[in-house]
Amino acid sequence: MDISEKLEKGYEIAQWRDDPWSPEGRKRYESALKKFGKLSQHPWLTELTSSDKVSILDLGAGRGIGGVALAKVLANKGLEVELTIIDLRESAVRDSLKFAKEKGVKAKAYKMDAVEAYRLGRFDLVLMYGAILAHFDSWALPRLFASAAEALEEKGVVVVEEMDRVHVIFMSKFKEFIVENPKPEALSISVHAGYDPVKGSYLRNYIRVKDWEVVTLPVNFRSISTIASTLWLFLKDIDIVKTETENLYLVLGKTPRRLLKPEHLEEPTVVKRGKPWNFL
């Protein structure tokens, strides 16, 4: 089972809130509209949207809640918006187009690895919304940010929504066992299954209780400062915006350095081996 199939299965089992037609998904969409409405007042966004047209690239978009919300906010300001959505899940790609159409947003969508997204050209806004960074290990994150920076127009802006996951775990402790979906008809849980010291990933088994189907996925936890400082390697200026939700932030970046391109980041020896070298 490749990573796209594992993600399909993981989202199916845990039923994370990326379905825009569910009550939880509608709530997320309304929250995103409000969030981006306020973000549009940031000086970097004000400068960027002073023209009459803007292009958006939504990386790891899921079913498009974040990208469609951002597009709607900018369209309501009178801008012509072109939205490009990419995700590794085939079902999410299909649903994102359906959702965008329902909301009157002009969109294209591709099943594609976000690390390869720079091949699609350059955009005014590159968005990473929701839990996308949790799917990228410590070696994949620089590749993701290199791709985002390379896909950015010279005066463009990168927008990353993320939790300060290290702070959350430090304050509340790491949980071995989590109820992912409490609904009786779709009850699912996750259980800690190990740790990969090379990639910095915590492995979790996601289990659907009614048939005990299991998929193992890596999860990655970072602080907001780590995300911001890593993005800074690829973009000259960085800002952090606090949202109304506790421990949830928007990290902004602008002015691509273009010194380190995605194709320069070849796998190092330790990642190829998959484990530390043992001198014993």
Feature annotation, model-predicted:
Residues 60-64:
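Class I SAM-dependent methyltransferase "Motif I" SAM/SAH-binding loop
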Residues 160-228:
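SAM-dependent methyltransferase
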Residues 142-154:
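A short glycine-rich, Lys/Arg-flanked "PGG" loop and its adjoining helix->strand segment in the class I
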Residues 124-140:
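A short SAM/SAH-binding and catalytic strip from SAM-dependent methyltransferases
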Residues 55-57:
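Conserved beta-strand elements of the Class I
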Residues 67-116:
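Class I SAM-dependent methyltransferase SAM/SAH-binding core
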Residues 233-280:
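C-terminal lobe and adjacent flexible extensions of AdoMet/dcAdoMet transferase-like proteins
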Residues 1-53:
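Conserved class I S-adenosyl-L-methionine
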